[in-house]
Amino acid sequence: MAKMIAYDDEARQGMLAGLDKLADTVKVTLGPKGRNVVLDKTYGAPTITNDGVSIAKEIDLDDPYERIGAELVKEVAKKTDDVAGDGTTTATVLAQSLVHEGLKNVTAGSNPIALRRGIEKAADAIVKELVAAAKDVETKDQIAATATISAADPEVGEKIAEALDKVGQDGVVTVEDNNRFGLDLDFTEGMRFDKGYIAPYFVTNAEDQTAVLEDPYILLTSGKLSSQQDVVHIAELVMKTGKPLLIIAEDVDGEALPTLILNNIRGTFKSCAVKAPGFGDRRKAMLQDMAILTGAQVVSDELGLKLDSVDMSVLGTAKKVIVSKDETTIVSGGGSKEDVAARVAQIRGEIANTDSDYDREKLQERLAKLAGGVAVIKVGAATEVEAKERKHRIEDAVRNAKAAIEEGLLPGGGVALIQAAAKAKDDVKLEGDEATGAAIVFRAVEAPIKQIAENAGLSGDVVIDKVRSLPDGQGLNAATNEYEDLLAAGVTDPVKVTRSALQNAASIAGLFLTTEAVVANKPEPPAAAPAAGADMGY
């Protein structure tokens, strides 16, 4: 494919135009009085959202230089979303302000490399002040307040606070569709996975069609159980104890399944067979999680273990197991707390090191099943479009609340950035173009509060001047247009969100300013129209 090349100011201005188109679309959503953006979909109903990264992902510009500029800012939003789960609009607004201020100075003759160093040093100094000003989350009300700000809905804030209070920081809060209007909250006790009994003959409770095993032994195997010999040996060992047996295997079929069912129906031996969840390496990892939780050992050919020769030491235990048609829940596994804690630490390390969103999500689910629990917020609304929009807001608010628990809270509404910058100025001693780069950051941090004020119908400059004269922690509550103590009023932002927004914006701004040439794909010429049919003489 042919390429287009632009240099110097032409390259930067083309990229800047793309940045502005994306940022101007995203920033209308900032603050409690921000507006929504409607996203057209090729199939199905349009999506209505105020989530910066969702809007950014949908923007695809025709001009190749503009497209590159927009893609760089998308990266700001995506990186902030990956790290903190929120703050994508703030990051976009900061990036736009930093790039505009920086390009003015590049055009005036400043050295882009020195500007970039100054921007990075000033951003680091402000982040240091933000972290120092953090207030730990100590109450359920504080979690509710920060989730309410993110979702713009007090009911959502309360539900999220209740969910996180129950499942803990390592727990998972998922958001699902509800077939009735409103919000419902469900909790899962113990480890639950999406596989049910292999045959309905294992059911012990006919009313709700579940198999309930009290104080069972648990056999975990990575292979299939097909022959009678695969189950008879272990069944005879467990039968002597008078306790039931849960079998979790790749599959149970052939002679093995009717052997278990027949003993179950006769009342000779109570058991239940379930397929192992997941596939491939993920299945192996989940079986190992269950082994650690229950104190079992996974029986597999790789370890040289055979079902016809193992003893009771490979079996795990649990207080109770509940198996339905579609899912299995293991309550109070008998594994060692130290082993569970070590496994949790290992999974946390894997989460920190993975670059895949899908892998991260699956690892977090495994972490929750081991260390916390699972809460499900079910969302119902009058229309599909409204339900999707509300669901999206709740997902953002959950991640916002988790970020607050992790690193603490700051005054919201863009105030923390201005007040941290005022303190950081004294620590940043630079000269020349590096000092100019730092000054760019100290001006750019005003952009979020200015945009919040303008979205609320106020003058941004007037609000900034007023906030500068107020004590630390006080600022504009844009929801009420009152100046007050923002932490006391529940107007807060997680430290993780605010610092990630600034760090990612500063990083992309530095790349923008130091760009001297852009190589882009040349647009394909439009296809020629098909030739008209020949005149047949009629």
Swiss-Prot record:
Gene Ontology terms for molecular function: ATP binding; ATP-dependent protein folding chaperone; isomerase activity; unfolded protein binding
UniProtKB keywords: ATP-binding, Chaperone, Cytoplasm, Isomerase, Nucleotide-binding
Origin: domain of life: Bacteria
Compartments, record wording: Cytoplasm
EC number: 5.6.1.7
Pfam families, sorted: Cpn60_TCP1
Broad EC category: isomerase
Family: Belongs to the chaperonin (HSP60) family.
Name the UniProt record assigns to this protein: Chaperonin GroEL
Species per Swiss-Prot/TrEMBL record: Bifidobacterium adolescentis (strain ATCC 15703 / DSM 20083 / NCTC 11814 / E194a)
Lineage: Bacteria, Bacillati, Actinomycetota, Actinomycetes, Bifidobacteriales
